[in-house]
């Protein structure tokens, strides 16, 4: 039986979805189009890259998720508290280790960008907290002047899994035309930035 599925988040607990996927496949279920948010985006992404439920279960069981909790040594100094990092970076941890982990798993399947996946195979939900907008990736990345097919899948997963104040938000910089009353400065492009976080908000 072929189905479409949406995987919700739930932090590390959401990773337990790997067992549910394995159980479903043992009952003959095949996942066609998949979508996910937060930790559910990780499961959906691995399925879209043709990892089986058993593969995902083994990956989860053998991954020390504490390895994602890394930050620059300067923010580990006693004179510089994690609170300062939170103030400066908007998160306790960067999220780079998570993105790298996902990218390595995807590269093993020949996947880097959404252009490497069949159309409509994967959708990832994230939140633009700067503009108060829910994003469905890759399509909505067009809002920022980017090509959906060129968007890194691992970066999209990091966006969706960036739990506010825990992981740094992913900053997207883009150019926006600004209309001015002055004819000389009319439609002058301005550099903007948006902070993208966990799609479960």
Feature names for model-found ranges:
Residues 1-37, 45-201:
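Patatin-like phospholipase
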Residues 41:
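Catalytic nucleophile loop
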